[in-house]
């Protein structure tokens, strides 16, 4: 088992979905309205798998060798590729406390996006410009859309979206998303489409102060390429890895690492190597030990020890103000 686990995703069909998961990444999508590829998922609504075993089955079989000694309880992350042919509904997600108290869910939903592809002039909804009391009144008057904050984005932009943030993906975008393992969404506005709305629960959880602009992140030169730290939050960390040569890595048994490649390369470990292509995702088990990435750009997500990671980055002179996350 101690090898990188290349995952077969679960596909989620959506009215707003399209075909770019196939045309860009060669994925065997089920229809021309495929909105999401759940790349790494132990969520019961859609399980990813490796060599015929679902991720929960692999976790049950290998335990901490796979997840790590510091990753306990429910598998914490859900990683997706999203093809938005049309605007998604304006929505918001609860935090852990609300999700557990009201919905009986183990997690709320903090997330982060990376814009993988978009058209010139692309925009996202990322926040609102009024308080919740005003928002309730404006919704009743049919004027919610006047208070949505839209931000311009381009390929490569990263947005950190904590629970409570009003947000929506714009049309004709391809997005990488890392989030807590939750499928709980409260819709505020559906652009005139026939979709169930959740106004009261949305207003319960909206934090009108959340929003802003894409994260700057910090770039570090490392052996074999660069490491860009974009988000460091108690829910997850997100880094962009550019392997211009052979980049040595190592696990210490405490946590797994999840990679999604956006260009081609290979992963090498003691006993083997495996090529990855753009759009593929793989897990590095916590007990793997030394491995290396050779070639390509990848997004790396993991469940961090925030205090330890902040100390390591600060020692390297990193300005943590440029890194998204609540710490």
Predicted features by range, described:
Residues 139-185:
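Loop-centered beta-sheet repeat module
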Residues 148-160, 174, 269-289:
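Short acidic-glycine-tyrosine-enriched beta hairpin
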Residues 186-253:
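C-terminal amphipathic alpha-helical segment
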Residues 79-80, 88, 105, 111-114, ...:
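His/acidic/aromatic-lined binding-pocket segments of jelly-roll/cupin-type domains
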Residues 129-141, 253-263:
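Short, basic/aromatic beta-hairpin or loop at an interaction surface
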Residues 1-130, 190-213, 238, 306-327:
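Transition-metal
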Residues 247-248, 263-269, 281:
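Short beta-strand segments in beta-sandwich/barrel cores
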Residues 74, 82-87, 118-121, 165-185, ...:
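Ligand-binding loop in jelly-roll beta-barrel domains
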């Amino acid at each position: 088992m101690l090898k990188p686990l290349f995952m077969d995703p679960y596909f989620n069909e959506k009215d707003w979905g399209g075909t770019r998961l196939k045309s860009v990444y060669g994925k065997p999508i089920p229809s021309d309205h495929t909105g999401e590829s759940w790349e790494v998922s132990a969520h019961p609504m859609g399980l990813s798998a490796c060599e015929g075993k679902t991720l929960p089955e692999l976790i049950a079989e290998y335990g901490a060798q796979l997840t790590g000694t510091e990753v306990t309880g429910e598998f914490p992350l859900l990683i997706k590729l999203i093809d938005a042919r049309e605007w998604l509904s304006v929505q918001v997600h609860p935090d852990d406390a609300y999700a557990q108290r009201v919905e009986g869910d183990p997690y709320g939903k903090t997330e982060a996006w990376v814009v993988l592809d978009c058209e010139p002039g692309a925009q996202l909804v990322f926040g609102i410009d009024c308080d919740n009391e005003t928002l309730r009144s404006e919704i009743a008057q049919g004027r919610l859309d006047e208070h949505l904050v839209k931000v311009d984005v381009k390929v490569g932009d990263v947005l950190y979206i904590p629970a409570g943030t009003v947000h929506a993906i714009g049309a004709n975008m391809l997005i990488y998303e890392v989030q807590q393992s939750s499928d709980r969404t409260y819709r505020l506005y559906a652009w005139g489409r026939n979709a169930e709305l959740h106004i009261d629960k949305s207003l319960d959880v909206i934090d009108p102060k959340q929003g802003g602009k894409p994260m700057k992140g910090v770039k570090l030169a490392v052996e074999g390429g660069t490491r860009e730290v974009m988000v460091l939050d108690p829910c997850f960390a997100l880094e962009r890895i550019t392997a211009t040569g052979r980049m040595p890595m190592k696990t210490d048994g405490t946590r797994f690492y999840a990679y999604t490649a956006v260009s081609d390369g290979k992963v090498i470990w003691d006993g083997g190597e495996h090529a990855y292509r753009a759009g593929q995702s793989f897990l590095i088990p916590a007990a793997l030990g030394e491995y290396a990435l050779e070639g390509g750009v990848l997004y790396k997500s993991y469940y961090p020890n925030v205090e330890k990671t902040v100390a390591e980055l600060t020692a390297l002179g990193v300005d943590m103000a440029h890194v998204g996350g609540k710490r």
